[in-house]
UniProtKB/Swiss-Prot annotation:
Pathway: Protein modification; protein ubiquitination. The chain crosses the membrane at residues 195-217. One of its GO terms (biological process) is ubiquitin-dependent protein catabolic process. Its EC number is 2.3.2.27. It is a single-pass type I membrane protein. PROSITE patterns: ZF_RING_2. It comes from the Eukaryota. A zinc finger (RING-type) spans 264-305. The gene is Rnf130. Acts as an E3 ubiquitin-protein ligase. May have a role during the programmed cell death of hematopoietic cells. This is E3 ubiquitin-protein ligase RNF130. It comes from Rattus norvegicus (Rat). GO terms for molecular function: ubiquitin protein ligase activity; ubiquitin-protein transferase activity; zinc ion binding. In testis sections, expressed in interstitial tissue and seminiferous tubules. In tubules, expression is mainly in postmeiotic germ cells and to a much lesser extent in Sertoli cells (at protein level). Expressed at high levels in liver, lung, stomach, heart and thymus.
Amino acid sequence: MSGAARAGPARLAALALLTCSLWPTRADNASQEYYTALINVTVQEPGRGTPLTFRIDRGRYGLDSPKAEVRGQVLAPLPIHGVADHLGCDPQTRFFVPPNIKQWIALLQRGNCTFKEKISRAAFHNAVAVVIYNNKSKEEPVTMTHPGTGDIIAVMITELRGKDILSYLEKNISVQMTIAVGTRMPPKNFSRGSLVFVSISFIVLMIISSAWLIFYFIQKIRYTNARDRNQRRLGDAAKKAISKLTTRTVKKGDKETDPDFDHCAVCIESYKQNDVVRVLPCKHVFHKSCVDPWLSEHCTCPMCKLNILKALGIVPNLPCTDNVAFDMERLTRTQAVNRRSALGDLANDSSLGLEPLRTSGISPLPQDGELTPRTGEINIAVTKEWFIIASFGLLSALTLCYMIIRATASLNANEVEWF
């Protein structure tokens, strides 16, 4: 496997960490400190001697708002062309301010335009403060961003409280409001507990991953060593068995020279005078130069699959199938020229046929195109191992990135919003 191919997963892991580090975190905005606002509301209903009062503890000063106390009557925008205007975004937004009112506070709903536009429009009509209520019932107030609005105080409250106040104003009931500075809330930075959690989680993940990889490669090494020992044992046994097999030289008049006699099943050539042949225990005959490499690897007859080790009593309990596959590429390279020549002669000679060899259970020799997948299979195996290693690295990087984002992410209540 090439170095570039190995570097591919590593580049993915590096890219994952880079993406994590460049994540457009809203936590940077959320890390801004903010101040809570304590709001007391007094409602004077007609015909009621004692005014109704309630307190709002979940208000929040805007980021660019002065943190100061203010008091005044609450007013909502007048309808525009008969349509209620709760947002304060329209250029025609107006407020009816009674002549006896010196300080008043605008009540507006969030949405449709930026906080800066709403606050600036209320300030244009001389409001001393703006209270903006949320437009989503289940959301807490956020820290509003409204640079350039001057000295006007801006506070956000929940939708529920805002609509409660608005309901009184729509009935022409006087509502007085006092806004006081509450608690300063420090930035919500990466807490020590989160850091410990991320560190422990990542260490545990890496330990598990490393243990799995160590176990995997130990097993692989053990398997490889056992296979190599078995191969050496079989190789030694095969050499010993080959030395005990009968070898003779074909002479004139021997049955092997008969045209009807089976050809050598390995090289598919007929036997000629002075050829050295090997006679196996099953009585099958092959060229010595052809069958010896085969027996060294397979220790079985190429035709009937007889185990020569068992037949000769050398290794009776060790099957030849434990050995690795015979390297046909090496054999065919040594016999390539002769085999192709023999195949050409057999194709041109109608008196000779390959049918007896086929019926004898001989597996056809692979062609050159069939040998190339062996290298491809090796590459696939190596690629698979590197993929397993790289997968754990990539998974660890992504997990660490996810945990960091989760640990640093703040609640919606700590977000800074522009509109």
